[in-house]
């Protein structure tokens, strides 16, 4: 039977996801057979698993850090918010329904928790170490009785716990004390120490706080991780991207149900992006409509709030328009939807020659494709699809050459006048394509072509893991785990 280590946080955004990612790589580098686990995640950023299911991007990244193929077992329950206090429930990678928060808490949660714990038990049997990520804070008084992602998991797994806090926000010592005081004695006993994340400054200034924590709780500070710029996606971190107007003004519309905005991280690093919330702001060189958890409702929101007219006017004035997944569907001529919104046929924005019909079966696949858009024609790209819709266009953006490694020949996406749309999430992580796309626009604007910096998720994981390893007591953690 393997061991379990759980990372809890004093709040959302404390650094749990990335600390788990780093620990996964650290223990993998030490030769341990390690896997990640999060019983329940609420996120609009998802990715395909090896089984053809859907998991959170955080556990997808952690699987890569473990050198494992991403599996639905690493994130059995995924909640995808739909608005109006409702979420789509995905269990073991497949949608099983849409419920209100109250109904979920009262009806489905316990059943799914039992099933998720069975998955966790199986992971412990098969691997040396399972590193578990908690969710939000483990001691929210109004939610504790319904919480199936934190201390109940830790106690079930007989895991050792690490409590991480974001010191960059301020109040980290108070947050740790408050969390520890609200934990039950048996929960507090599982905590082996504390980690302070995103610290800037002289670490010695924190010593009085460390001494206080050790004296009060008998538990050490295991590490202080310096604040560092990195390119690893932080879960649901849209707010982390400031408005940046580079030499090209790239605007992304912040839809009410925006999903998979990790698609645009390469654009952020290569040029800068501007997330737009008002239609009068739409005057960029590029306007992007991102993916959406509820395509038709977001299309109607664009229409009712003046964005549709602003997009058409900006396009007429020379803006290049791009749609990714749901954004592509919105830019087409029409959508027939009896699945997500059940509104039937809805007129699209009409900038792309495409028609979309929603189907009940969700496609969740890794794709290899060849681009047909003229400035990058013939270029090989890869990405993934997570969608209900099937679109038809006489001018496809690309041809899918392989689905999950199996050869195929399937047109996808659409090309319009100064516009394209694609189902390929991760298209801009193909750096050769992104460089070609940006330079096409730069030359149009009278700017010199540039070479954009290449980087890989693998390199970023290794770099961040090394930083964490240098700043936490790995030997002590190993000792506590009995490894």
UniProtKB/Swiss-Prot annotation:
Gene3D superfamilies per record: 3.40.50.880, P-loop containing nucleotide triphosphate hydrolases
GO biological-process terms attached to the record: cobalamin biosynthetic process
Domain GATase cobBQ-type: 247-433
Flavoprotein found in the keyword field: no
Keyword flag Transmembrane helix: no
Residues at the active site: 325, 425
Pathway(s) per entry: Cofactor biosynthesis; adenosylcobalamin biosynthesis
Name of one Pfam family that matches: CbiA
Gene Ontology MF term list: ABC-type vitamin B12 transporter activity; catalytic activity
Keywords annotated in UniProt: Cobalamin biosynthesis, Glutamine amidotransferase
Database matches in InterPro entries: Class_I_gatase-like, CobQ/CobB/MinD/ParA_Nub-bd_dom, CobQ_GATase1, CobQ_N, CobQ_synth, GATase_3, P-loop_NTPase
Role played: Catalyzes amidations at positions B, D, E, and G on adenosylcobyrinic A,C-diamide. NH(2) groups are provided by glutamine, and one molecule of ATP is hydrogenolyzed for each amidation.
Family affiliation: Belongs to the CobB/CobQ family. CobQ subfamily.
NCBIfam families, per database record: cobQ, PRK00784.1
Name by which UniProt lists this protein: Probable cobyric acid synthase
